[in-house]
UniProtKB/Swiss-Prot annotation:
Record-stated family: Belongs to the QueA family.
Assembly and interaction partners: Monomer.
Gene giving rise to this polypeptide: queA
Subcellular location(s) per record: Cytoplasm
Name of the protein described by the UniProt record: S-adenosylmethionine:tRNA ribosyltransferase-isomerase
Gene3D superfamilies per the UniProt record, alphabetical: QueA-like (3.40.1780.10)
Keyword set includes Disulfide bond: no
Amino acid sequence: MRVDAFDFDLPPERIALRPAEPRESARLLRVRPGAAPELEDRTIADLPDLLQPGDALVVNDTKVIPARLDGTRTRAGGSTVAIEATLIRRLSGSAWAAFAKPAKRLAVGETVVFAGASGGTLEARVLDKLESGEVHFAFALSGPELDAAIDAIGHMPLPPYIAAKRPEDDRDRTDYQPVFARVEGSVAAPTASLHFTPDLLAKIAARGVSRYTVTLHVGAGTFLPVKAEDTTDHQMHAEWGEVSPETAAELNAVKARGGRIITVGSTATRLIETAATPEGSIRPYLGETDIFITPGYAFRASDVMLTNFHLPRSTLVMLVAAFVGHETQKRAYAHAIASGYRFYSYGDACLLER
């Protein structure tokens, strides 16, 4: 399909710069293709009532790391330049791949000293520069010591459409982190997860809905635009994920009992679909996935998806169109824009039913 088929105009004021407070007050658009009504305006607080006893809620327990680092490169003679690096992929115990700005001012072998706003520094040497724009850094620390240093001096990697309008602050340390985050490794939040609170999770459990975790580390590629004119020419970025044998067995048991698989976010959806067989059985999975889901894809495992409202021409809006049908997706997004829904990472959500 042509990528411009997934384009739409979004007024700038529809982009959320902060999450709803309280979280459960965020709006929720229920989308049921072929039902009457097809579109139903609710709130996140209504979610327990929209699920059924016996359903399984699948959440991504990845944890966002403060992956944006500010530093200085100094050359012999004293010339300096400010460097901003966003870590995107761990290469070893002491090395990371990153996007750096301005990368053209860095040379292999040079040292960058990253510093935190409240003190502390971290040195890194430029190992390599790739044509893709990646810069590989070897840090002076390794393992848990490196992790602690990054946590101390790093900034939360807010999406470009938020960072362009306001600076990151202390609130983002909690606002941009899901309540069930556990496994460090993401450089962007699985944003549908941001709507959950302990109280909401307790109400969902009381409804008779079980909860299972998978892990998919969200990479910076989630923000990269689709440059191809046709979806068949786009290469999806790869992200690391895991579905444990125990979780796979439990989800298969839920399906065997007639329960629905409710995937929270595009990350959990893509991982579960990667792990599923054509017959719908979910297998244990460990490794990278670059699954690219577009209209025409036959879903194997996910029955219902909770997700935010996404960017025009993005792979995420293509996933939504695949889930409920392209025409339904267009109607849902037009309704959301006209009705004042808030878009993107800190915005409102939709509950998609197939």
